[in-house]
Amino acid sequence: MIQQESFLTVADNSGAKRIQCIRVLGSNRRYAHVGDIIVAAVKDAMPNMSVKKSEVVKAVVVRTKATLRRETGNSIRFDDNAAVLINEDKNPRGTRVFGPVARELRERNFTKIVSLAPEVI
């Protein structure tokens, strides 16, 4: 579960390395799960890239350490909390996605992120 002040690694090549959650988008929501959109501040970025440090961005959560329970009864858990930066059209800002992503992103209409990911779990 991601909440305000949570740090996430960035799973794309947009230039940001770490982001900190500022707000979970939605009506009075406290926690974000896989597939939810958050507003975040870039805390660590690579030089000479499109995303700069202290920039406020939107991101979609693709992996969480918290256990994700599926309708089939399966549960899945990742090793880190990770997100992919998106633009206003909900398309990824980077051209590559690193690491596995959850299948729930396809149900939330983030098909571009799913197609860029090397593995969908």
UniProtKB/Swiss-Prot annotation:
List this protein's GO terms for biological process. Answer: translation
UniProt cross-references to Gene3D superfamilies, sorted A to Z: Ribosomal protein L14
Which cellular component, as a GO term, is one annotated location? cytosolic large ribosomal subunit
Question: Known CDD domains for this protein?
Answer: Ribosomal_uL14 (cd00337)
Kindly give the InterPro entries that the UniProt entry links to this protein.
Ribosomal_uL14 (IPR000218), Ribosomal_uL14_bac-type (IPR005745), Ribosomal_uL14_sf (IPR036853)
**What Pfam families does the annotation carry?**
Ribosomal_L14 (PF00238)
SUPFAM superfamilies given for it? Answer: Ribosomal protein L14 (SSF50193)
Q: Which UniProt keywords apply?
A: Ribonucleoprotein, Ribosomal protein, RNA-binding, rRNA-binding
Q: Name one GO molecular function term.
A: large ribosomal subunit rRNA binding
Q: Which family does it belong to?
A: Belongs to the universal ribosomal protein uL14 family.
Task: Spell out the subunit comment.
Answer: Part of the 50S ribosomal subunit. Forms a cluster with proteins L3 and L19. In the 70S ribosome, L14 and L19 interact and together make contacts with the 16S rRNA in bridges B5 and B8.
Q: What's this chain's function? A: Binds to 23S rRNA. Forms part of two intersubunit bridges in the 70S ribosome.
Query: What is the protein name stated in its UniProt record?
Result: Large ribosomal subunit protein uL14
Q: Which organism is it from?
A: Prochlorococcus marinus (strain MIT 9303)
Gene name, Swiss-Prot/TrEMBL: rplN
